[in-house]
Amino acid sequence: MSKVTSSTLIKFKQEGKKFTALTAYDASFAGAFDSEGVDVLLVGDSLGMVLQGHNDTLPVTIADIAYHTACVKRGVARALLIADMPFMSYSTPEQTMNNAAILMQAGASMVKLEGGHWLLESVKMLTERGIPVCAHLGLTPQSVNVFGGFKVQGRDADNAQRILDEAKALQAAGAQLLVVECIPAPLAKAITEALTIPVIGIGAGADTDGQILVMHDVLGISSGYIPRFSKNYLKQTGEIRSAIRAYIDEVANGTFPAEEHTFN
């Protein structure tokens, strides 16, 4: 199979082909996900919660992400590899550039940043310097203390319009991919239709171009709170590779996410 790039995902969007993404943190799981056909792998700052045992993602460092990116890279042959830029690692232009370079040198093909209008100059700067950017809107976990918890975003008209406007602005600034998290399904659909770049949803309904989940949720090994938008595929298949194939198949045929995984 040929390597997945941002151009591949744009082609999928144009063809109406739904694609899948998962988080990954080591070479073994990354290799299994990659060989089964997962299109995008994200070394997420979610590792702070699922690997390190924190209550949120804020303690994660650039060194943490770089280490796990290098691990995942060794297991990947096909999937597009994205690395999260963690909390307070992109506050100034110089810091943003230096930290993004660290992640690219560790093996990432793209970096992901959370935020809206305030990020536009950073997105433009990174893109102009050859570092592809995935933007992230809606529930941005690094802002959990501002939101007052992990809450659905964009439910009122003003905030929905703000998120849509930010999505368009981030695309114009050069973002090649967008993640929307925990927003109402109609808003996610409007964003997906308004943009030419691919949109990946998590807790955002079935009308985005792709879906992403945390691997621990897909495999039923998360402890504590289980998000409404997640699904335990290992429970229904009994085997890891079969679980991943079931996830890919259900995204492709539109049966995941179902209504019970969606916010309105």
From Swiss-Prot:
Gene3D superfamilies assigned: Phosphoenolpyruvate-binding domains
Residues given in the record as 3-methyl-2-oxobutanoate binding sites: 45-46, 84, 112
Pfam families linked: Pantoate_transf
Catalytically driven reaction(s): 3-methyl-2-oxobutanoate + (6R)-5,10-methylene-5,6,7,8-tetrahydrofolate + H2O = 2-dehydropantoate + (6S)-5,6,7,8-tetrahydrofolate
Residues where Mg(2+) binds: 45, 84, 114
Entry cofactors: Mg(2+)
Catalytic residues identified in the record: 181
Enzyme class: transferase
Keyword presence, Transferase: yes
Functional pathway: Cofactor biosynthesis; (R)-pantothenate biosynthesis; (R)-pantoate from 3-methyl-2-oxobutanoate: step 1/2
MF term (GO), any: 3-methyl-2-oxobutanoate hydroxymethyltransferase activity
InterPro entries xref list: Pantoate_hydroxy_MeTrfase (IPR003700), Pyrv/PenolPyrv_kinase-like_dom (IPR015813), Pyrv_kinase-like_dom_sf (IPR040442)
Subcellular location: Cytoplasm
Keyword Magnesium: yes
The protein's Enzyme Commission number: 2.1.2.11
Biological process, per Gene Ontology: pantothenate biosynthetic process
One Gene Ontology term, aspect cellular component: cytoplasm
Swiss-Prot/TrEMBL keywords: Cytoplasm, Magnesium, Metal-binding, Pantothenate biosynthesis, Transferase
Cross-referenced PANTHER family: 3-METHYL-2-OXOBUTANOATE HYDROXYMETHYLTRANSFERASE
Function: Catalyzes the reversible reaction in which hydroxymethyl group from 5,10-methylenetetrahydrofolate is transferred onto alpha-ketoisovalerate to form ketopantoate.
Record family assignment: Belongs to the PanB family.
Subunit-structure text: Homodecamer; pentamer of dimers.
Name of the protein in question: 3-methyl-2-oxobutanoate hydroxymethyltransferase
